[in-house]
């Protein structure tokens, strides 16, 4: 294992970023197990649409136990824009040019499922050099991007298909973070093996940090403290929840992670102000290590997301030992229902209100017990072991989906 080299490519995710640490965790785990790591990322912070400072980059390289390579890239201001596509293409093509002469057949490359240009150019490295390549499916283009303009959506879909159609079949193995993502994979490749490897929760953030939790009592049942961990981007629609809170002041909602720049932030605050809702609290962006402090006195974690996936916030709730309510029918609702760790309802205020008023203290205790039973299956320590077995296996036919 000491001679094994892994190249991890994370254009928007690294030790520099505050959101998303799956790839840095992969890199740390492989490094601790004796692998040689090269981690490629960029100087552009996608979440905040800004460049990292020289100081931030220097400090990141200083604390990194492996080799961190930070490239300058073209910045952009919109998630859906020509400039972003150009930036993605330039990064991916330059990566190919620089790596093709350096990568050896014995090396392994691990990349995320976006941008699609990266999927294509890394598949060319496999075609030419024979290296093993692994894809971590956390997001799916073009499906995941919400484009209302029909012509633009058609053009973007065509653009994505150009890069995906003949690329995914070359991948040695893939990991999908939500079951429905396999449908996307099979659209382009019938035989590429894949295994369910969810995002999971970090034991260092949660274990031994939940002491002093304020317990609910029979005295205040049906007066639950609700929480949403999310920035109010397009895919997060909390309006059904706010409509419920408008007429149910005995419930409270805390929103963690909104910095005032979310796409829905203006509409949400306007609705709260217009209806004089006083039982909603904004906390703002919270450091990962401080999240447990903000969830320790909450009763139920909410996921009001219009797109399908099983995001990090689900595992924040699991880490905090909270039952979960999912609005809508999607991968997250299937996950919660399968393990009986919460509830799901239709995506409207009437269904949400009916559900909330049906939840008693006894129901909550039962769901909490189920959370306790299953949560360790989804801690990252265990998931990393599964990941390690696959990327170090001599024959990658362990778990076909």
Please provide the spans of the model-predicted regions.
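Active-site donor-binding acidic/aromatic loop of nucleotide-activated sugar
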Residues: 264-265, 277-287, 294
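Membrane-proximal helix-turn-helix segments that form the acceptor-binding/catalytic region
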Residues: 25-26, 93, 97-100, 104, ...
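A charged, aromatic-enriched C-terminal amphipathic alpha-helix characteristic of glycosyltransferases
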Residues: 349-354, 361-393
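Acidic donor-binding loop of glycosyltransferase active sites
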Residues: 172, 277, 293-309, 322
